[in-house]
Regions:
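Bacterial Sec-dependent N-terminal signal peptides
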Residues: 1-22
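Extended, low-polarity segments enriched in aliphatic/aromatic residues
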Residues: 22-314
């Protein structure tokens, strides 16, 4: 009996520690090539082996994807390869040939090598949570990399409510068929019509955890950065997005994707705004899509914590 109570107390203490644990999230108000390098260096994680920098290449020139000029210095400092996957809906990135033309139009290929991860096929990663998806389908080139910088543009999203590092790790790293598998909550890798919203969000969280776990193997690692600029209610996958109504906020980074996305959401929801600076459209987009649930479910899966310590590097 004493042994039982001792084990119980240890378990309760561990649960209490986990509930109170905080992850560090670094923050700068400056959005520049220099500040992007500075906030990455604040993480104190040194890359090893071949480095992937996961970005979104943007559906059109009207999309609000991160500019090559902004990311060039960081990517070149780590000798990184820009990585992306083809989309699941045709358009300018629906196959590798048109996607490479899009990449060239954006100028990404002028700053670093660019690898379309699913250009030669796809592989399956195991998932911890099989409620909806039973594996995560990603580009077959992913095992070529030892270190990933998940470099996301934080903004709204038509389906997920918002897009940050969790979406960039899940939908972003998924192959074309893998994207459909997540969107359909494990029903199909082909065209889907309608999915329960929470099932889709929970599938994203499970897929993000699969990618995180892959890069937490011995000899590998992953870090996360959100750039909070040009925050339209629409994703960079939209070729004709709404104009941003919210002013730029800065760059945030962490080794914990849950804490990072939560910190960005908190900045948006607590923002007072003013003339020409209106957070309400983005807040409405997040709320109507139940977007916060992705973060909540990712925490439930053990991917990270919503408790964070925001550290300014300015």
């Amino acid at each position: 009996m004493k042994k039982f109570f001792k084990s119980l107390m240890v378990g309760l203490a561990l649960c209490s520690f986990m509930a109170n644990a905080q992850s560090n999230v670094y923050f700068t108000k400056e959005i520049s090539p220099e500040s992007l390098v500075k906030i990455y260096e604040a993480l104190g994680v040194n890359p090893t082996g071949k480095v992937a920098v996961k970005i979104s290449t943007g559906e059109s020139e009207k999309s609000h994807h991160l500019s090559p000029d902004l990311i060039r210095q960081l990517v070149q400092n780590v000798d990184g390869t820009l990585v992306e996957c083809n989309t699941a809906y045709g358009g300018n990135r629906g196959d590798s040939e048109t996607h490479r033309k899009t990449i060239a139009q954006r100028g990404y290929d002028k700053i670093a090598p660019v690898d379309i991860l699913d250009e030669e096929g796809e592989i399956m990663l195991p998932v911890n949570d099989t409620t909806w998806i039973h594996y995560d389908i990603v580009g077959s080139h992913l095992p070529n990399y030892d270190f990933m910088i998940n470099l996301a543009h934080f903004k709204g999203h038509q389906m997920g409510g918002f897009g940050g590092v969790l979406k960039n790790a899940s939908i972003g790293v998924a192959s074309s068929g893998g994207k459909l598998y997540i969107h359909s909550a494990g029903e199909t890798t082909e065209k889907w019509t309608k999915t329960d919203q929470d099932a889709f969000l929970e599938s994203m969280a499970a897929a993000a955890q699969a990618v995180h776990n892959y890069f937490k193997q011995e000899g590998k690692d992953i870090v996360y950065i959100n750039v909070m600029n040009n925050m339209s209610v629409d994703c960079d996958c939209n070729g004709n997005p709404a104009s941003p109504e919210l002013l730029d906020m800065g760059i945030l980074a962490s080794t914990d994707p849950v804490a990072l996305d939560k910190a960005c959401l908190d900045l948006v929801f607590s923002h007072q705004g003013g003339d020409g600076d209106n957070p309400e459209p983005l807040i409405e987009r997040i709320n109507t899509r139940h977007g916060m649930h992705t973060v909540e479910y990712a925490e439930k899966l053990g991917l990270g914590t919503q408790n964070y310590n925001l550290i300014s590097i300015d």
